[in-house]
Amino acid sequence: ASDVYKRQNALIVIAVPMTAVGEVLDAIQEHAPSCGITDVVSVKTAVRQQVLERGMESRYVGGHPMAGTSKSGWDNSQRDLFRRAAWGITYDYAAECEARGEKIPKQWIETFTEVVRMTQMVHAEAVPIRVANHDAAVARISHLPHVFAEILAVVGDNGGILAQSLSAGSFKDATRVAGTHPELVQQMCETNAPALVEALDEALDLLRDAREKLDSPEPSIAELSDAGYRARTRIDARSGARKES
């Protein structure tokens, strides 16, 4: 079978929870030792470490499509899920080769090219990125929102039947990802704990400041609401430009 994969220049996409990545890599090492490899796992440092431990870095290019919903399973499949989505593609191995003055292996270049081609096939937009930068960024815009969604859901639920009955747009928007299967959230956040803690500390500083200002003789969150509005406007402008491209 491995000869068939080699002749077809196969690209293997690892799409499993982080806890199963090592087992899948071992199977690839045994059955498809010459195939290019990518993945769609939401944390890149941990996956790359598993790849490095097995000496498979010259045929691995990490990937992460910024798409998905809180639902999972075949029944929740979406035909255009990746359309206009940013798709992070890592290039650490190439950068390290260049830093050492070494030639980048042809297989890695071909694998990188195939990963980019795959993103084009599903109408996503490739974003070259270093592993550490990826994990730091998604800690802020993906993993921290999961933590806050869980917190908001718990606080809202603690309000009892009345709060539950009155919950509507803003609450449901803010807690949507709390509907994600708990094990998936745990693996995602715990695997990226160092970067997530840094983002969480920044968020806690903002929360403490907001609390102090609300607990003053003249309560105000003007500074926070203005900063949040401007930040969201910048984010919308950036993602909007991608959608219109």
Where are these regions (language model features)?
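Rossmann-like NAD(P)(H) cofactor-binding subdomain of soluble oxidoreductases
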Residues: 24-75
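Long, positively charged, glycine-interspersed low-complexity recognition regions
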Residues: 233-245
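Short, small-residue-biased leader/transition segments that mark boundaries at the very start
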Residues: 1-5
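N-terminal Rossmann-like NAD(P) cofactor-binding module of classical short-chain dehydrogenase/reductase
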Residues: 12-13, 38
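Internal alpha-helical scaffold of NAD(P)-dependent oxidoreductase catalytic cores
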Residues: 79-177
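An anion/phosphate-binding loop that grips the pyrophosphate of nucleotide cofactors and donors
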Residues: 9
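Interdomain hinge/lid region at the active-site interface
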Residues: 161-232
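Short glycine-/small-residue-rich Rossmann-like dinucleotide-binding loops
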Residues: 16-18, 41-42, 65, 152
